[in-house]
A protein has these predicted regions:
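Active-site metal-coordination/substrate-binding segment of hydrolases
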Residues: 57-126
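Acidic/histidine-rich catalytic neighborhood of metal-dependent amide-processing enzymes
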Residues: 101-185, 200-202, 208
Length: 244
């Protein structure tokens, strides 16, 4: 992953809230235009991106994130601090404050996912990316996902779990993948390397729940380094995000 701290700060500084996602959608569309990526928006403002550099691609990997947060719209000044990860180690972290120096909630849930998707789009030769609206109020965007976009998707990965040790196997009661599947057998060594204490978990809904419900491909979701999510004191441990 492109370890671009300034770009990460830029992504995290975009204010966005469920049903008030215009600034994030604008940020993403401007970025995608600047990079000349092939993308489109649907009527809900879900964003669908395809990067194809090989002619023989039959099925694409797909990464997804959501463009909303739970935090009210406010000025976001991203500040570097040193804060604990799950293991209690003090790490370089990012936290958000408004112009009155009050914590606002940085919205790593799921701006960390947005950053991860954009970073992978930069480095992988063939990839599909979906940015869904209003996940926090019931997967509103992903439940209306454009089915034609996913016709040639082989699997979907979401970056939308807190801290640095969680892998979502069940999401809102929906089984996302089989432990004995070729998909997870290929995933597992990467988790053991970058997330050595990972645990398979059952989590509330996120967008891969919708995709697994709608389509016949494996999905997975895992930790991407945000802590104290849905609170004003939310922060992002940079190393954990890069590892994801």
């Amino acid at each position: 992953m492109t370890q671009d701290l300034e770009f990460l700060k830029q992504v995290l500084s975009v204010p966005t809230k469920s049903r008030q996602e215009g600034l994030m959608v604008e940020f993403l569309t401007n970025y995608l235009k600047e990079k000349n990526y092939d993308f489109y928006l649907d009527a809900m403002s879900n964003i669908y991106v395809t990067k194809k550099t090989s002619d023989d691609v039959e099925y694409f990997p797909c990464v997804v994130s959501h463009t909303d947060t739970v935090h009210k719209l406010d000025t976001i000044n991203v500040v570097q601090e040193y804060l604990p990860n799950y293991q209690g180690e003090i790490k370089l972290s990012l936290k958000a404050y408004n112009n009155m120096d009050e914590p606002t909630g940085i919205g790593g849930d799921d701006k960390c996912g947005v950053f991860a998707c954009l970073s992978l789009l930069e480095i992988l030769p063939n990839l599909k990316v979906a940015f869904f609206v209003s996940e926090e109020i019931g997967c509103v965007g992903s439940l209306k996902a454009d089915k034609t976009f996913f016709d040639n998707v082989g699997y979907a990965i979401q970056f939308d779990a807190p801290e640095n040790w969680m892998v979502t196997q069940y999401c809102y009661g929906q089984k996302l993948f089989d432990e004995q599947s070729e998909f997870f057998i290929k995933c597992e060594p990467n988790f053991k390397e970058m997330m050595p204490n990972f645990v398979l978990e059952s989590h509330p809904y996120t967008d891969v729940y919708s995709l697994r419900k709608l389509f016949d491909f494996s999905c997975i979701n895992f930790s991407c380094g945000y802590y104290q999510y849905h609170t004003r004191n939310e922060y992002v441990v940079v190393e954990d995000l890069y590892n994801s």
